[in-house]
């Protein structure tokens, strides 16, 4: 019995999870770049002394934010996971767990986004994350909620929820490239009978269907020359890569994905024409327009949820941005 004929593929990204988008090289690089750029910066717990804010290195929060937030997680992986959650799911939920004796934060539990239900009407979070040992109903003030782009101020949306069409095109392009290399660039087409109306019927239709399956299987097996029986004709219908401007469309999707993430193409190794000065300016623009909003969002949320309102003007959290300005003397002076 002949195997069924192949049909057109639908991009897995249209119906799959957002995490599957990491199979696309540009998405993977953008997510990795943003998450590791945030994690690479130490965050300082600052205390007001006189008229100046100074680092409070003896604070328990300093240890949690820079060394070990949870029992089995280091700070770098912790911040990487937070930014990845924001980019891929739109939300990152952190629950501070306090020591009942000292009343200090004992650990910062990063919850799985799928285990959190946010009731925006009553501003409550229902969490059932037994892996991280966090479950119950929490008030809005008890959960550190880092959001992506939000339309209502309460729930974040992932970048991929807006870039799904472009990402789907990129995924389809990758699949098409794989198929072109896998089958040697075999063509697609129609099996027809050149006798027009004469001789057609149920039996002839079944024979044409069987011929189509046989020809498709022969092309799939790697044959380049296939004989057709009788007056059966094969008419190719697929366009070549040149006709489809296939490579140009793939270049376009790379830059289109970069636009959604706010990442310059040079950071995903797409633009090879940059000189040293333009690369330096791209790095400065990346910090000021792309990375800094994420840093500011995290700093504000930590201050709001970890510091009492009466001390909010005397404490602050601040990422040390000096490392990112290492090559830009003008920005370091400012």
Per-segment meaning from a language model:
Residues 1-246, 250-252, 256-259, 263-266, ...:
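Structured, contiguous alpha/beta core segments that scaffold functional sites
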Residues 189-190, 253, 298, 332-334:
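A general alpha-helix detector
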Residues 228-235, 272-275, 307-324:
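A glycine-rich phosphate-binding loop feature that marks nucleotide/adenosyl-phosphate handling sites
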Residues 240-243, 283, 331-333:
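Short, surface-exposed amphipathic charged segments that create phosphate/polyanion-binding patches used
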Residues 279-280:
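Small-residue-rich helix-loop
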Residues 283-308, 312, 316:
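Long, compositionally biased
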Residues 324-334:
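Charged substrate- and nucleic-acid-binding regions of tRNA-handling and nucleotidyl-transfer enzymes
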């Amino acid at each position: 019995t002949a195997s069924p004929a192949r049909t057109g593929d639908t991009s897995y990204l249209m119906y799959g999870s957002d995490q599957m988008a990491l199979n696309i090289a540009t998405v993977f690089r953008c997510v990795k770049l943003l998450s590791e750029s945030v994690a690479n910066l130490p965050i300082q717990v600052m205390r007001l002394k006189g008229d100046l804010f100074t680092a409070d290195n003896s604070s328990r929060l300093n240890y949690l934010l820079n060394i070990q937030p949870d029992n089995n997680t280091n700070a770098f992986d912790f911040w990487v996971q937070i930014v990845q959650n924001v980019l891929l799911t739109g939300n990152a939920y952190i629950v501070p767990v306090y020591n009942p004796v000292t009343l200090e934060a004992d650990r910062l539990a990063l919850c799985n986004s799928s285990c959190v239900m946010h009731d925006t009407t009553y501003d409550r979070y229902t969490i059932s994350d037994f892996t991280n040992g966090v479950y119950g109903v929490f008030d809005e003030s008890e959960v550190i909620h880092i959001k992506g782009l939000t339309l209502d101020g309460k729930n974040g949306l992932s970048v991929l929820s807006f870039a799904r069409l472009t990402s789907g095109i990129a995924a389809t392009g990758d699949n098409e490239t794989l198929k072109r290399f896998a089958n040697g660039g075999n063509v697609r087409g129609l099996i027809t009978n050149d006798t027009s109306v004469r001789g057609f019927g149920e039996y002839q239709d079944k024979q044409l269907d069987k011929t189509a399956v046989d020809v498709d299987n022969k092309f799939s097996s790697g044959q380049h020359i296939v004989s057709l029986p009788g007056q059966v004709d094969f008419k190719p219908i697929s366009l070549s890569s040149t006709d489809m401007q296939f490579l140009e469309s793939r270049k376009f999707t790379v830059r289109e994905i970069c636009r959604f993430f706010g990442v310059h193409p040079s950071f995903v190794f797409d633009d090879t024409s940059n000189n040293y000065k333009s690369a330096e300016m791209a790095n400065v623009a990346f910090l000021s327009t792309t990375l800094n909003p994420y840093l500011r969002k995290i700093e504000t949320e930590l201050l709001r949820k970890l510091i009492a309102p009466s001390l909010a003007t005397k404490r602050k959290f601040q990422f040390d941005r000096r490392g990112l300005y290492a090559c830009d003397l003008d920005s370091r002076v400012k």
